[in-house]
Amino acid sequence: MNKKKYLCPCCKKYVFAEGPGSYEICPVCSWEDDKIQAENPDYKGGANKLSLNECIKKFNSVLALFLTIAVFIAGLAGLSGCGTASGSTANTSANAVITDAQESTTKVSTSDNTQTRTYTFRNQKLLNSHYEKHGKDMGFSSAKEYEKAASAVVTNPDALHKTEAEDGDDVYYVESTNEFVIVSTDGYIRTYFNPDAGIAYYNRQ
């Protein structure tokens, strides 16, 4: 993986610490940094249910709706004498909400990571974001339960395993349960989900 900082290709507002292929989830638009989808914007079946191009369209439509509402509210405030409405005010309000949403995500406290052979996410923030995106849909009742299951995939002797040639990350896949896990070169879980494309997604790594 490219270790340089990487601008989210969906919202173009958040910068991943590294990428593409970090599997970090953008706190602004919720796009997960999937290298295959970054390189093939129309590809479905990876870490994101929608293709990158579909995610971009969805984000832009939501942002446009929000800006329309913000302008409307600002206009009402101006009519009521609470202040003057302007396009710059609306844009400032929109950016403030996006910033607040980003900060609320990043202020989650960091948990202590264990150095045993039980694999974990790098910190609580990453665990929580992946649990919210994938774990609940997979039926797990808690983030810790989701993390424990991801670790079990890595240690499962029946799991398919390969090392990514470009970045050295370890990729694990259990075909019978359609479970996919990536572990970083320093031993932390990057992501865990059920790819819609199944083993075809694993084979593309």
Task: Outline where the language-model segments fall.
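Compact soluble domain cores
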Residues: 96-167
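Bacterial signal peptide processing site
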Residues: 83-85
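Short cysteine-rich clusters marking metal-coordination/redox-active sites
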Residues: 8-11, 26-29
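Functional cores of ribonucleases/endoribonucleases
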Residues: 141-205
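Residues immediately within or flanking Cys/His clusters that coordinate Zn2+
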Residues: 5-6, 23
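Short, non-ligating residues that shape and space the ligands of small metal-coordination modules
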Residues: 17-18, 33-36
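Short, intrinsically disordered terminal segments enriched in charged and Pro/Gly residues
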Residues: 40-65
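Bacterial Sec-type N-terminal signal peptides, specifically the leucine/valine-rich hydrophobic h-region
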Residues: 76-79
